[in-house]
From Swiss-Prot:
BP terms from Gene Ontology: cell differentiation; small GTPase-mediated signal transduction
Protein name: RAS guanyl-releasing protein 1
The record's note on its domains: The phorbol-ester/DAG-type zinc finger is the principal mediator of the targeting to membranes and is required for functional activation through DAG-binding.
Residues that hold Ca(2+) 1 according to the record: 479, 481, 483, 485, 490
Domain Ras-GEF, first and last residues per copy: 201-432
Membrane topology type: Peripheral membrane protein
Zinc finger (Phorbol-ester/DAG-type): 537-587
List of residues binding Ca(2+) 2: 506, 508, 510, 517
All copies of domain N-terminal Ras-GEF, residue ranges: 49-172
Activation and inhibition: Regulated by F-actin polymerization and probably by calcium.
Gene3D superfamilies (UniProt xref): 3.30.60.20, 6.10.250.2730, EF-hand (1.10.238.10), Ras guanine-nucleotide exchange factors catalytic domain (1.10.840.10), Son of sevenless (SoS) protein Chain: S domain 1 (1.20.870.10)
Occurrences of domain EF-hand (ranges): 466-501, 502-528
Name of encoding gene: rasgrp1
Membership in a protein family: Belongs to the RASGRP family.
C-alpha cells in the first residue's frame, strides 16, 4: 500500500506501470496526430487551445493575459487562459517571480510612455488580487513584493494605477468567510437532539458526518492541490492533511465503536448500524465518508470477527457487499467513476481517487514541449481537474446540522491508533481459533491506502477546544435544572458514545458529575487516545496480593484471599480478571523493581489527623485544586487542569459504604524543587462524615513514582481503611511505640473537639443551603402553576 506521505510510491518517468488514466490522457492529447488510434471519451469538456496546443513561452503567456483586458478593465478573449495562468503558474515559477516580471514590464512600459499597457498591467494585477486573494494571505513574500510595487507606482505619480493595485482589500477580506458560509447550523430549540450513539438514527449520523466532511473539503484551495501534485505528500499542507486525517479518523472510529462492545450481539448491532449509515451517505452522495465507513467495516480487524458476523442478517451483508463493490479499486475505480459522473448537484468525491488522477496526469505529461515551450495542454488539463473539485465547494449540502452533535462527533474522531493496536483489541474480543478451517479468500478490503500514512494528531490546544465545546453541549442538553451537575447514569450513556473507555469518574456529590469532572475525564481520555497512542500489550500475570490493592482500570477493590487479580510485569498495572481485556492504558516499561517492593502497599509512618483548613495543614498535602495532574511524556504544562478529589465507593463486610478520597499532593510551585518528588495523600473520611468536606486523615505515601500510566492518582502505596475511634487510637498507639500518655490524650481530645466544631459549622451551612434551595423550588413551582393557569 502506498501513502501520500511517501514520495517513493509516486509513478515516475520511464516506469512500466503508468496508471491507465495517464495513458488515456496521452491518447486524448495526441488523437489529432494519430487518427488510427480510437478516440477516448474526454473526462471534461476542454476549450479549444488553437495555436497554444503546441505550447508557448512564459513571456508570450504573460503578454496574452495582459492583453485580455481592455482600457476599461473588461475582459475579452483569453479569459480562461487568464484563469489558468493565475491559478497554475506555481508549476512554472513562484508567485513572487511572476509579480516581479509584471513589475519589470510596467517599468519598461512607463519608460516608453506606453500608458495604455501600464493600465492593462494594473487591471491584470487587480484581478489577481481580487479573485485569488488567498495567495496573498498565505504568502508573506508575495504580499511584501506587492506593497513594494505599490510604493513604486505611487512614487512615479500614477495615482490612478496606485488605486487599482491597492493592497488594502487583501487585509479587509474575512479569512473565515469561505470557511463558515453556506452551511447553516440548526439553532432550533423545538427538537431535542440526542447525544447518545445508540439513540442516533443512521440518517442523522450520516448528515452530521457529511457536515464535517464538507467543512474540511471546502477549505482545500487551488494552491493546496497544486502543492500536493508537486510534492506528492501533505507535508506543510494543513488543509489537505486535515481532510485526510478526518477520513482516517472516521475509519478508525467505526472500527473501535464496533470493537468497544463486549458481546458479539452488541458488536453486530453497531456493525449493522454503520452499514445503514453507509446507505444514507450514498444517498447524500458523500463518497469520501462512504469510503471511510466501508473501509473501516471491511478492515481485517473487523472482518475476522466471525462470531460477530454470524449475528448480522443476510440482507445487511448484501448491502455491505454492494457498497464494497461500488468502491472497489478494480479497473481504476470504474464502478465509482460511473456512479459519480451520473450524480448531480451536491456531491463529495473520494478525494484520494482524484488526487491520484492529478498525480498520474502530472507524471504522464511533460512540463515543456519542443523548443522549451510550456506545455499549455497539461496546465489546461490540470486546471480542469482541479477546478471541477473547487466548483463542488460552492454547492451547499441538503442538510441542517445540530452543533451539539457536531461537537460530540468532532471529539470522538480525535483518535490516534496503530494497526497493531487495532488487531490487539480485535483478538482480545475474539481470540484466534487454531482449530477453525481456513477462511475462504474474499474480496480485497476497501481501504483508503492513499491516506494511510497520515495520522490525525490534533494538538493539545485543539483537543482542549473540542472538549470544551462537547462539555458545553452535554450540559446544555442534559443539565435541565442548570445546577452544574448531570447524573452518573446519563454520563455513562454519553461516555458509551465514545470508542474509548476510561477510569471511574470523580464524584463531588454522590451520583452526580460536575462540569469540571467531565471536562477532566475527556481531557485525559482524549489526550491519551489522540496524542499519546495506546498500547494494549500488557504482560499480565495472575497475582496474590498480600496487602489491599485497587484495580487501575475501574478503581475497584481487588477482593479475595489468593489470586485476587492480575499484575503487569512490565509496568506494574493491577486489575481485575474481568478488566484485563478492557485496559486502555498504554504499557510503559519501567526500571526493574522487585515484586516485594512493588507489592508493599504502605510504608510505616506516623498517622496524623489534621483538620481541613486548620493550622496544622502544610503545603505538602494541598487540596485537590492545587494538585496538578501529571501527564505521561512530560505534557503536564500543556494539559494543566483543575482536578477534584477522587472518591471511590467501597463496600465493607457489613454492607456499609466507605468513601475513600484520593487527591494528589504536590508542593507549591514556589517551593517545589527538582530533587523533591511528588507524594500522594490518601484521605479516608469517616463513614458518618463522608458527605461533608470535613476532617480528613492524611497518610504520607512513599515518593516512589508510579510505573502505571494511569492518569488517576496512583494507589500502589495506599490502601482503604475503615475509620473508627478504636482503630485510629490503636494505630496511633502502635506507631508511637507505646501507650499514649495523658498529654497525648488531651491533645487528641482537643483535636476532636476542634473537628466537632468545624463539622457543626459545616452542617449549619448545609442546612441553610437546603432551606434556600427549598425556597427556590417552591417559588419555581408557584411560577410554573401561574404560567400554566394563565396559558
Amino acid at each position: 500500500m502506498g501513502t501520500v506521505g511517501k514520495k517513493k510510491d509516486r509513478p515516475t518517468h520511464g516506469c512500466s506501470t503508468i496508471p491507465k488514466l495517464a495513458l488515456e490522457l496521452k491518447q486524448i492529447i495526441h488523437s489529432t496526430t494519430h487518427p488510427k488510434v480510437p478516440p477516448v471519451t474526454p473526462l471534461r469538456v476542454m476549450m479549444p487551445l488553437g495555436k497554444l496546443s503546441k505550447g508557448a513561452s512564459l513571456d508570450d503567456l504573460i503578454q496574452m493575459c495582459i492583453q485580455a483586458f481592455d482600457l476599461d478593465g473588461n475582459m475579452g478573449q483569453n479569459s480562461e487562459l487568464l484563469q489558468i495562468m493565475l491559478t497554475m503558474h506555481g508549476f512554472l515559477l513562484p508567485s513572487t517571480e511572476l509579480l516581479m516580471k509584471l513589475r519589470t514590464l510596467y517599468q519598461d512600459a512607463l519608460q516608453n510612455r506606453s500608458f495604455s499597457f501600464c493600465l492593462r498591467i494594473c487591471y491584470f494585477i487587480r484581478y489577481w488580487v481580487t479573485e485569488l486573494w488567498v495567495m496573498f494571505k498565505m504568502d508573506a513574500k508575495l504580499t511584501q513584493a506587492m506593497e513594494e510595487f505599490q510604493e513604486l507606482v505611487r512614487s512615479k505619480g500614477e495615482e490612478l494605477h496606485w488605486r487599482l493595485i491597492d493592497t488594502a482589500q487583501i487585509n479587509s477580506r474575512d479569512w473565515s468567510r469561505k470557511l463558515t458560509q453556506r452551511i447553516k447550523p440548526n439553532c432550533s430549540k423545538k427538537r431535542k437532539v440526542s447525544l447518545l450513539f445508540d439513540h442516533l438514527e443512521p440518517q442523522e449520523l450520516a448528515e452530521h458526518l457529511t457536515y464535517l466532511e464538507f467543512k474540511a473539503f471546502r477549505r482545500i484551495s487551488f494552491s493546496d492541490y497544486q502543492n500536493y501534485i508537486v510534492s506528492g505528500c501533505v507535508k506543510e499542507n494543513p488543509t489537505m492533511e486535515r481532510s485526510i486525517a478526518l477520513c482516517n479518523g472516521i475509519s478508525q472510529w467505526v472500527q473501535f465503536m464496533v470493537l468497544s462492545r463486549p458481546t458479539p450481539q452488541l458488536r453486530a448491532e453497531v456493525l449493522t448500524k454503520f452499514i445503514h449509515v453507509a446507505q444514507k451517505l450514498h444517498q447524500l452522495q458523500n463518497f469520501n465518508t462512504l469510503m471511510a465507513v466501508i473501509g473501516g467495516l471491511c478492515h481485517s480487524s473487523i472482518s475476522r470477527l466471525k462470531d460477530t458476523s454470524a449475528h448480522v442478517s443476510h440482507d445487511v451483508n448484501k448491502v455491505l457487499n454492494e457498497m464494497t463493490e461500488l468502491l472497489s479499486s478494480c479497473r481504476n475505480y470504474d464502478n465509482y467513476r460511473r456512479v459519480y459522473n451520473e450524480c448531480t448537484n451536491f456531491k463529495i468525491p473520494i478525494l484520494g481517487v482524484h488526487l491520484k488522477d492529478l498525480i498520474a496526469l502530472h507524471e504522464a505529461m511533460p512540463d515543456f514541449l519542443e523548443d522549451s515551450k510550456i506545455n499549455v495542454p497539461k496546465l489546461h488539463s490540470l486546471y480542469n481537474h482541479i477546478n471541477e473539485l473547487i466548483q463542488l465547494q460552492n454547492i451547499a449540502p441538503p442538510l441542517e446540522a445540530n452543533m451539539d452533535l457536531v461537537h460530540l462527533l468532532t471529539l470522538s474522531l480525535d483518535l490516534y491508533y496503530t494497526e497493531d493496536e487495532m488487531y490487539e483489541l480485535s483478538y482480545a474480543r475474539e481470540p484466534r481459533n487454531h482449530r477453525a478451517p481456513p477462511v475462504t479468500p474474499s474480496k480485497p478490503p476497501v481501504v483508503a491506502d492513499w491516506a494511510s500514512g497520515v495520522s490525525p494528531k490534533p494538538d493539545p490546544k485543539t483537543i482542549s477546544k473540542h472538549v470544551q465545546r462537547m462539555v458545553d453541549s452535554v450540559f446544555k442538553n442534559y443539565d435541565l435544572d442548570q445546577d452544574g451537575y448531570i447524573s452518573q447514569e446519563e454520563f455513562e450513556k454519553i461516555a458509551a458514545s465514545f470508542p474509548f473507555s476510561f477510569c471511574v469518574m470523580d464524584k463531588d456529590r454522590e451520583g452526580l458529575i460536575s462540569r469540571q469532572e467531565i471536562t477532566a475525564y475527556f481531557m485525559r481520555a482524549s489526550s491519551i487516545c489522540s496524542k499519546l497512542g495506546l498500547g494494549f500489550l500488557h504482560n499480565f500475570q495472575e497475582t496474590t496480593y498480600l496487602r489491599p490493592t485497587f484495580c487501575d482500570n475501574c478503581a475497584g477493590f481487588l477482593w479475595g484471599v489468593i489470586k485476587q487479580g492480575y499484575r503487569c510485569k512490565d509496568c506494574g498495572m493491577n486489575c481485575h480478571k474481568q478488566c484485563k481485556e478492557l485496559v486502555v492504558f498504554e504499557c510503559k516499561k519501567r526500571s526493574k523493581l522487585s515484586v516485594g517492593e512493588n507489592s508493599s502497599m504502605f510504608d510505616s509512618g506516623q498517622l496524623e489527623v489534621i483538620p481541613a483548613g486548620g493550622k496544622g495543614q502544610t503545603n505538602d498535602c494541598l487540596g485537590a485544586e492545587e494538585g496538578p495532574y501529571s501527564y505521561p511524556n512530560g505534557d503536564g504544562d500543556i494539559h494543566t487542569e483543575v482536578s477534584k478529589d477522587r472518591t471511590i465507593m467501597l463496600m465493607g463486610s457489613s454492607a456499609q459504604k466507605i468513601s475513600v478520597r484520593l487527591q494528589p499532593a504536590v508542593k507549591h510551585r514556589a517551593t517545589q524543587t527538582e530533587n523533591e518528588p511528588q507524594s500522594l495523600c490518601l484521605q479516608v473520611p469517616s463513614p458518618q462524615r463522608s458527605r461533608t468536606p470535613g476532617l480528613t486523615s492524611h497518610l504520607p505515601i512513599s515518593p516512589m513514582p508510579s510505573p502505571c500510566p494511569s492518569p488517576v492518582p496512583t494507589r500502589k502505596k495506599a490502601y482503604a481503611k475503615w475509620e473508627n475511634k478504636d482503630s485510629i487510637r490503636k494505630a496511633r498507639a502502635e506507631l508511637r511505640g507505646g501507650k499514649a500518655g495523658i498529654q497525648e490524650l488531651e491533645k487528641e481530645k482537643a483535636l476532636l473537639k476542634e473537628e466537632n466544631t468545624t463539622l457543626k459549622i459545616q452542617l449549619k451551612d448545609a442546612q441553610r443551603r437546603v432551606e434556600t434551595l427549598r425556597a427556590e423550588l417552591r417559588k419555581y413551582v408557584l411560577d410554573s402553576d401561574v404560567h400554566q393557569t394563565g396559558s
